[in-house]
Amino acid sequence: HPLVHRYWHDANVAVQDFTNEGVVVSGSWPFQVNTLVANKQPIASVVPDEGATGWADTTMLATNAKHPNCAYKWMEWSLNAKVQGDVAAWFGSVPAVPAACKGNALLTDTGCATNGFDNFDKIHFWRTPEAACSTGTCVPYSRWATDYVAVMGGR
């Protein structure tokens, strides 16, 4: 269909699609919205009444890490409010440490609200596909991955 462009898989490509390819509506992250606003593009965003999908990244430590003390120090550093605020400002995310929402020069005191802090209850978090689930409607990861590639390819 001529109004269907593509399913984006790269946030910067999505920004370019809005800027240069005539895309006028899409699902996105705050990163794209903030980038388009910074580039003076006519853009706005909304979380629908039904909610939106999203995710929370994690940092994991391998059980047999060669230098676990170093890894723990990095994890501790990454949870610092300044670091969390800076990353949230750059990526358009909400920090894992709520204290990062205030007093960060990059994020500003309105950054968490801009990036959706108050919409947390409207987010339906992504889950890893499961082959077996209580509803019997789940698909294995391999099928999900194949279908995802097909969607990205427009099939």
Residue ranges and their predicted role:
Residues 1, 16, 77, 91, ...:
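Extracytoplasmic/cell-surface-exposed regions of Actinobacterial cell-envelope-associated
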Residues 1-2, 8, 22, 37-40, ...:
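Sec/Tat-exported extracytoplasmic proteins
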Residues 1-48:
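Ligand-binding pocket segment of bilobal, Venus flytrap-like solute-binding proteins
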Residues 6-10, 53, 62-67, 136, ...:
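Extracytoplasmic/periplasmic, Sec-exported soluble proteins
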Residues 8, 29, 55, 144-148:
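Tryptophan-centered motif/residue detector
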Residues 15, 19, 27, 72-79, ...:
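Non-transmembrane alpha-helical segments in soluble domains
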Residues 53, 57-124:
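Mature extracytoplasmic/periplasmic domains
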Residues 122-155:
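Conserved C-terminal helix/tail region of periplasmic/extracytoplasmic solute-binding proteins
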